[in-house]
Amino acid sequence: MQITLLFHTPLSVCSHATRTCWQSFEKGDCGGEKDKELIDRVGNKFKHASTLEHLNYTFYIQGISRACLQEVARHRHTSPSVKSTRYTLKELRNEAEFKIGDFENASRYLVLCGNEEVDNASIKALENLRTILQKSISLDIAKYCLPESYKTELTLTINARSLQNFISLRSSKSALWEIRNLANALFEALPQEHKFIFEHCLHKDIE
């Protein structure tokens, strides 16, 4: 899994939006400590979380499974652009046979869970897909036999309020292990000066 932060809204935009309510612009410091305190107090402590929606983040997320992607898609107020299997499954056509037990080779296309029986079943499904792609079957039809562990990538834009919800729910040990890793990786990818907005959302119970 690889996370790249492509864009983030400056804190000064959020503080300006917040100060609009009280017309207290003269008290701002262009995203400095005064503005950070205001954002934390109004958005987090006073729970006026709509002010946090002025902050947007765009991440490039690579190497998550389609199973994890389904979990991500359940979250509202996000804008995902996902790698299309319709146009990209042809990447498998020139591959050699994927053999049971060859986890290193299969991991180029699959997210492996560490359970040998499950991972070998995923490799078998990957090989079945590769075989089908050798035939004159359209990618639109062939993709129906994609294993859930097949790697994908997406560009995801999400506002701070929604990201708080995502991190709060998905960093919990009760979440799917892969999306738990994703939630923590998204937090780590944030600009250091933005992390104060999300620190209280992180679960500390990860083993």
UniProtKB/Swiss-Prot annotation:
Q: Which cofactor does it need?
A: FAD
Q: Which molecular-function annotations from GO does this UniProt entry contain?
A: flavin adenine dinucleotide binding; NADPH binding; thymidylate synthase (FAD) activity; thymidylate synthase activity
Residues reported in the UniProt entry to bind dUMP: E71, V72, A73, R74, S84, T85, R86, K143, R170
Task: Give the pathway annotation.
Answer: Pyrimidine metabolism; dTTP biosynthesis
Q: Where is the ThyX domain?
A: 1-204
Catalytic residues, per the record, are R170
Name the cystine pairs.
none
Q: Which domain of life is it from?
A: Bacteria
This enzyme catalyses: dUMP + (6R)-5,10-methylene-5,6,7,8-tetrahydrofolate + NADPH + H(+) = dTMP + (6S)-5,6,7,8-tetrahydrofolate + NADP(+)
Keyword annotations for this protein, in alphabetical order, are: FAD, Flavoprotein, Methyltransferase, NADP, Nucleotide biosynthesis, Transferase
Q: EC?
A: 2.1.1.148
Example GO BP: methylation
Enzyme category, top tier:
transferase
Task: Specify which residues bind FAD according to the UniProt entry for this protein.
Answer: S50, R74, H75, R76, N159, A160, R161, N165
Motif (ThyX motif) on chain: 74-84
**Cofactor binding mode and count:** Binds 4 FAD per tetramer. Each FAD binding site is formed by three monomers.
What is the recorded function of this protein according to its Swiss-Prot or TrEMBL entry?
Catalyzes the reductive methylation of 2'-deoxyuridine-5'-monophosphate (dUMP) to 2'-deoxythymidine-5'-monophosphate (dTMP) while utilizing 5,10-methylenetetrahydrofolate (mTHF) as the methyl donor, and NADPH and FADH(2) as the reductant.
Quaternary structure? Answer: Homotetramer.
Give the similarity note: Belongs to the thymidylate synthase ThyX family.
- Matches recorded under NCBIfam families: thyX
- Tell me the protein's name: Flavin-dependent thymidylate synthase
Source taxonomy lineage?
A: Bacteria, Pseudomonadati, Campylobacterota, Epsilonproteobacteria, Campylobacterales
